[in-house]
Regions:
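Histidine phosphotransfer helical core of two-component systems
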Residues: 2-13, 24-78
Length: 78
């Protein structure tokens, strides 16, 4: 089991975690909305749209990794 963390350390870690997750949500949301708009307007899907979808998936993958790391940390603390 890891060393006891102070309440302040836990709060700072949680704040950073939430900040990182929020950033990735904004990226995934924004990029996917651009592509959705293109699809709704029946415009052809271009390389830029593919890049946006890739960025969206990358952001989701990063969130998944952050959640797994956080879950591991919390299991170590309990």
């Amino acid at each position: 089991m890891m060393n006891e963390m102070t309440v302040e350390e836990l709060a700072l870690g949680e704040r950073k975690f939430l900040h990182d997750i929020a950033n990735h949500i904004v990226v995934a949301h924004g990029m996917s909305n651009f592509v959705l708009k293109t699809i709704k307007e029946s415009k052809p899907i271009g390389a830029k749209d593919i890049e946006r979808l890739e960025k969206s998936i990358e952001a989701i993958n990063k969130m998944t990794a952050l959640l797994k790391e956080r879950r591991t940390l919390l299991h170590q603390l309990t």
